[in-house]
Amino acid sequence: MNQHYRDTRKIDPTKGALLPDGTPNDNDRVEIGPTQLAFREWENAGLVMPNLERMREYRWTRLTQHIVDRDLGGLLMFDPLNIRYATDSTNMQLWNTHNPFRAVLLCADGYMVMWDYKNSPFLSEFNPLVREQRSGASMFYFSNGDKVQQAASTFTAEVEDLMRTHGGNKRIAVDKIMVAGLKALEARGFEVHEGEEVTEKARAVKGPDEILAMRAACQSCEDAMHVMEAYARAEIPKGGISEDDVWAVLHAENIKRGGEWIETRLLASGPRTNPWFQECGPRICQNNEILAFDTDLVGPYGICCDISRTWWIGDAKPRQDMIDAMKHSVEHIQTNMEMLKPGVTINELSANTHVLHDKYQAQKYGCLMHGVGLCDEWPLVAYPDKHVAGAFDYPLEPGMTLCVEALVGEVGGDFSIKLEDQVLITQDGFENLTAYPFDPALMGEG
């Protein structure tokens, strides 16, 4: 049987010129995205696909409006996730977090310019909203040595020229910039404003296609979790399986679906779950003990799925104190979730939180909720004893997405329970985007 070139050049030969998300069905395209496995699973789950062209335009429009609303001439971004939000393009994302070679300037008139690695200007050409591709934004010592100031002067001269044409003033917001870059902007007479305030608030309210993309990413994350759970339950009782072995499954399954990375190493077993935040390591998991994790997973479309589960692995029943802690954790996140609706303020969420038992207070989580999108995002909802007056005086809005947290463990104990669900604020309440079940044995049902 002949295989035609028109089929071999497609990512999915069964589809037409476009994939279900509206992107080119071109096997050799530059743009990254979900794999056929992800699309099949989403179709089987009955999910509606996002349209990425609309999603990109929504983000660009929203960022531009936030610039105009603040009477800024432009927004200069170095954070790779802000660049992803503005352009939907990627380039060595983790390397870029500590070597800021990329920059994007979005001007008040919507004109957007990307400075990329000199050998890869093509990585954002798929998005027509990026009007120019340049290079030369690197202002870090590894790249420029003792000529950092010279590099900063050259780069900021380009920014000044663009702002003169497209900005209308010299008020510029900047998210994260090297010291030499900040000094060079100020030397050119720019009035520098806090860029993260702009980007975080713009990113906080998701558009319709972003919400569809998040549903898809959450489905892929949970599909990967199911594979990891099956592996853990089958292999740990046999012996010789490390925490790293289990965690590697989630990484692999994420990548198989077109996901991108995992932000943390928060998987621990047995006594290493208390205190929480011990990183996944070489410990050999034991039969009849707890395994807890927090996904912090950046999946398809660069969307973060940040959920936590705690499993009981073994053939015996968990202790009653473990069951009690698990039920208390579920009560905590479900009760707090019921407060969520448009108009409720961050301060009200803090003040009215479900109160953990005294024995769990010392080791409770760092927040009771936080925003989520491309990663953990604004806002943060603090517990009352960590609440800072004036830090988050804002109401919830439809389209915001939050993660609702619980960490329950006693000081000096031999286990912790970690739970977390991802939630969408709707027009009249909330929708829990997380379908993954709680462990029945720890719920006392096994």
Where are the model-predicted features located?
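Active-site neighborhoods and metal-handling regions in enzymes and metal-associated proteins
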Residues: 1-446
